[in-house]
């Protein structure tokens, strides 16, 4: 007497689980695509900053106009300024990158 009842409950539970599984799969497939995350440069800083490294830090090409360099510098500094919780080390590297891109290098390297 209990066996048919247990079998019925098992069939009902399987049907409900299948229904919710199908609904979850359809919702998963219908979700909007996530934007692709930009891949970050995996290397560290060089002892003496090159123009290529400066361009990578500022997010510009190596052969870009001075106005674009200044605009990129401002954008990156706003995001990483020490007064806004950013790192002093990164701020010095960003400033050094701007100097390298604008041709104002002192060949002294970073203070850090």
Curated annotation (Swiss-Prot):
Source organism of the structure: Arabidopsis thaliana (Mouse-ear cress)
**Task performed by this protein:** Component of the PAM complex, a complex required for the translocation of transit peptide-containing proteins from the inner membrane into the mitochondrial matrix in an ATP-dependent manner.
The entry's protein name is Mitochondrial import inner membrane translocase subunit TIM14-1
Please give the subunit comment from the record: Probable component of the PAM complex at least composed of a mitochondrial HSP70 protein, TIMM44 and TIMM14. The complex interacts with the TIMM23 component of the TIM17:23 complex.
Question: Which lineage?
Answer: Eukaryota, Viridiplantae, Streptophyta, Embryophyta, Tracheophyta
Q: Where in the cell is it found?
A: Mitochondrion; Mitochondrion inner membrane
Gene that encodes it: TIM14-1
Membrane topology value: Single-pass membrane protein
Q: Per the record, GO CC terms?
A: mitochondrial inner membrane
Q: Which UniProt keywords apply?
A: Acetylation, Membrane, Mitochondrion, Mitochondrion inner membrane, Transmembrane, Transmembrane helix
* Residues spanning the membrane: 7-23
Question: Per the annotation, which location comes first and is thus the protein's main one?
Answer: mitochondrion
The chain residues annotated with the modification N-acetylalanine are 2
Which InterPro entries does the record cross-reference, listed alphabetically?
A: DnaJ_domain, J_dom_sf
List, for all copies, the residue spans of the domain called J: 53-112
- Into which family does the record put it? Belongs to the TIM14 family.
């Amino acid at each position: 007497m209990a066996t048919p009842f247990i079998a019925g409950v098992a069939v009902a539970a399987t049907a409900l689980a299948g229904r919710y599984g199908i609904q979850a799969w359809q919702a998963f497939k219908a979700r909007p695509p996530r934007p692709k995350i930009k891949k970050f440069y995996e290397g560290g800083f060089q002892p003496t900053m090159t123009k290529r490294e400066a361009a990578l830090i500022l997010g510009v090409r190596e052969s870009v106009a001075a106005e674009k360099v200044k605009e990129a510098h401002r954008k990156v500094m706003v995001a990483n300024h020490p007064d806004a919780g950013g790192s002093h080390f990164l701020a010095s590297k960003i400033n050094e990158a701007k100097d390298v891109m604008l041709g104002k290098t002192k060949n002294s390297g970073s203070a850090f």
